[in-house]
Amino acid sequence: MVFRNVGRPPEEEDAEAAREPGPSELLCPRHRCALDPKALPPGLALERTWGPVAGLEAQLAALGLGQPAGPGIKTAGGGCCPCPCPPQPPPPQPPPPAAAPQAGEDPTETSDALLVLEGLESEAESLETNSCSEEELSSPGRGGGGVGGRLLLQPPGPELPPVPFPLQDLVPPGRLSRGEQQQQQPPPPPPPPGPLRPLAGPSRKGSFKIRLSRLFRTKSCNGGSGGGDGTGKRPSGDLAASAASLTDMGGSAVRELDTGRKPRLTRTQSAFSPVSFSPLFTGETVSLVDVDISQRGLTSPHPPTPPPPPRRSLSLLDDISGTLPTSVLVAPMGSSLQSFPLPPPPPPHAPDAFPRIAPIRASESLHSQPPQHLQCPLYRPDSSSFAASLRELEKCGWYWGPMNWEDAEMKLKGKPDGSFLVRDSSDPRYILSLSFRSQGITHHTRMEHYRGTFSLWCHPKFEDRCQSVVEFIKRAIMHSKNGKFLYFLRSRVPGLPPTPVQLLYPVSRFSNVKSLQHLCRFRIRQLVRIDHIPDLPLPKPLISYIRKFYYYDPQEEVYLSLKEAQLISKQKQEVEPST
């Protein structure tokens, strides 16, 4: 610590030595000033400086009521207090003469080094450095945080007695406002001894203060180095504030170690996240391509890329969000993004920015609105159901029923490009297949059926899906004629370009006039299930005729009948030689 050995002039010492001590002069100057406030220098009255309450506390602390009085209190020099108030006090001794203060010092300016030492020293050391000698009474005034700091930050406790209230901590009235503002800051260090006289000029500790301020960056914390008065100095109150940040350095270092182990958020995440991100990505998320592909406009720099086909699933919750009402989709936008929590609800007095799902009581729902069925693909009216779409398909001429790919190629042989027909798929995993002519070759592809919709692609969000096969084929014919939308088949041979799919000329099974026998069979097959045909009241040859596979085309029937006749004749020929 830095102390200044500044004493009084020799003339005042000789005048005091020449006088005989009176009864009140036997007391130490601090007790004498406490008993007689008029003995203070002009302009330093307690009531005028801190008010009547603080003045009374100062007098009680000066009389030693805050701690046990006795000779145990030591001065800075190591001796006992010369005050005659304790039992058997030693006679007062005049202080040794010291050099006068330099003209360039400012008594109201306190260096950062003293503030650091004051913040780091213990209360026991502060008890040893405080004394009731006459040198402390003549010390210069410190910052306004001295009295308030000792009254608020160092309360008397059971372990350590409170520090006697020093009267030399009084400041001129010009420093009152700043001292009152910094009452919560740590107390400044004990002042160097010297006479109480106003001095002006720059401090010789300015260079050390500047070095410390650069080291601890106290200028940026206090908002600048000017201190608000336009000069380059800071008042003692501001220095006390910087000392408070320095004394907290140890605790903040420990807190930084703890916080360093926790996951920190970046500035962008902390600005846009209202709640904690500790359970990140706990559930499945929906790809942004799948969500926004239908919302891209023509002005998008990139064309809409079709998302990959999903895994096959029979769950009813796969694509149920596409048919829910708008209020259900708009309100919990995060419901499809299950990893992010929902934002907090708005206050009750503020209008909602988006419609929310309000819980409806059972009694209110019965009287307010009729029950509405969930509009999912499996619950539709009978006109658009799967069975109705199949009944509608049977009336179309380009549907040939059960037919393999060889027979389809025979039907399309010699037809122009764009000719097509629809038949039952030979693969049990699929329902229908499409056979068409393109580039002089007959191609075959399976038609996808996903949740009651038909298309050539299995993706559920494919925009050209239809509820019935007839509707899909009609739209495909329309797109093929105007050329706005084309289908392409990926080639199984690597390196070959995809094959365009154009449906222009349907090959109808009604192109040839059928026999009455064939039409009757066709009608029976429409009305009777194939497993109920043997129960019909008909002769066995007629039942076998009705149960034949190719009941849509009589020519195929004739062809098969000829093959059967040949096989029967061969079997007969083999049986005859053996007999």
From Swiss-Prot:
Substrate-recognition component of a cullin-5-RING E3 ubiquitin-protein ligase complex (ECS complex, also named CRL5 complex), which mediates the ubiquitination and subsequent proteasomal degradation of target proteins, such as DAB1 and IRS1. Specifically recognizes and binds phosphorylated proteins via its SH2 domain, promoting their ubiquitination. Residues 89-99, 155-165, 185-196, 301-311 have a biased composition (Pro residues). One of its GO terms (cellular component) is plasma membrane. Widely expressed with higher expression in brain and testis where it is expressed by spermatocytes and early spermatids. Also significantly expressed in spleen, skeletal muscle and kidney. Pathway: Protein modification; protein ubiquitination. Residues 206-217 have a biased composition (Basic residues). Transmembrane segments: none annotated. Residues 398-507 form the SH2 domain. It is a peripheral membrane protein. Its main location: cytoplasm. It is found in: Cytoplasm; Nucleus; Cell membrane. One of its GO terms (biological process) is radial glia guided migration of Purkinje cell. Substrate-recognition component of the ECS(SOCS7) complex, composed of SOCS7, CUL5, ELOB, ELOC and RNF7/RBX2. Interacts, via the third proline-rich region, with the second SH3 domain of the adapter protein NCK1. Also interacts with GRB2, INSR, PLCG1, SORBS3/vinexin, and phosphorylated STAT3 and STAT5. Interacts with SEPT6. Interacts with phosphorylated IRS4 and PIK3R1. Residues 1-25, 89-270, 295-315 are annotated as: Disordered. Disruption phenotype: Mice are smaller and half of them develop fatal hydrocephalus between 3 to 15 weeks of age. They display subtle alterations in glucose homeostasis with an enhanced response to insulin which causes hypoglycemia. Pancreatic islets become progressively larger. Conditional deletion in neuronal progenitors leads to impaired cortical lamination due to increased levels of Dab1. It comes from Mus musculus. SUPFAM superfamilies: SH2 domain (SSF55550), SOCS box-like (SSF158235). Keywords: Cell membrane, Cytoplasm, Growth regulation, Membrane, Nucleus, SH2 domain, Signal transduction inhibitor, Ubl conjugation pathway. Residues 124-492 are annotated as: Mediates interaction with SORBS3. The SOCS box domain mediates the interaction with the Elongin BC complex, an adapter module in different E3 ubiquitin ligase complexes. This is Suppressor of cytokine signaling 7. InterPro entries: SH2 (IPR000980), SH2_dom_sf (IPR036860), SOCS7_SH2 (IPR035866), SOCS7_SOCS (IPR037346), SOCS_box (IPR001496), SOCS_box-like_dom_sf (IPR036036). The lineage of its organism: Eukaryota, Metazoa, Chordata, Craniata, Vertebrata. It comes from the Eukaryota. GO terms for molecular function: phosphorylation-dependent protein binding; ubiquitin-like ligase-substrate adaptor activity. Gene3D superfamilies: SH2 domain. Residues 502-552 form the SOCS box domain.
